[in-house]
Amino acid sequence: MEQQQQQLRNLRDFLLVYNRMTELCFQRCVPSLHHRALDAEEEACLHSCAGKLIHSNHRLMAAYVHLMPALVQRRIADYEAASAAPGIPAEQTRDSPSGS
């Protein structure tokens, strides 16, 4: 059940990114709706816009994948520190200036 929920969240996230990219590029590249078909300039603009956004998304995901292990280790250390100090809530330990 948890796996299905994760798959649904992934699909939702993908569709949100796709819809936002489509909206952004369409607003940027299609100034009028006077014709049914896109002209060559509009098609080239849409292709370039989508390509840039996809490339940016890939770079962000690569950075996220690179940084994620360090973030996980930090959260584990914060959790262990909070568990070691009885009577102090985990949120207080993590949010304190010395926990940064």
UniProtKB/Swiss-Prot annotation:
GO CC annotation terms, alphabetical: mitochondrial intermembrane space protein transporter complex; mitochondrion; TIM22 mitochondrial import inner membrane insertion complex
Disulfide-bonded cysteines: 25-49, 29-45
Transmembrane segment boundaries: none
SUPFAM superfamilies for this protein: Tim10-like
Nucleus recorded as keyword: no
Coiled-coil annotated spans: none
UniProt motif (Twin CX3C motif) ranges: 25-49
Membrane topology: Peripheral membrane protein
Signal sequence residues: none
GO biological process, one term: protein transport
Entry keywords, A to Z: Disulfide bond, Membrane, Metal-binding, Mitochondrion, Mitochondrion inner membrane, Protein transport, Translocation, Transport, Zinc
Domain notes from UniProt: The twin CX3C motif contains 4 conserved Cys residues that form 2 disulfide bonds in the mitochondrial intermembrane space. However, during the transit of TIMM10B from cytoplasm into mitochondrion, the Cys residues probably coordinate zinc, thereby preventing folding and allowing its transfer across mitochondrial outer membrane.
Family per similarity comment: Belongs to the small Tim family.
Complex and partners: Component of the TIM22 complex, which core is composed of TIMM22, associated with TIMM10 (TIMM10A and/or TIMM10B), TIMM9, AGK and TIMM29.
Protein name: Mitochondrial import inner membrane translocase subunit Tim10 B
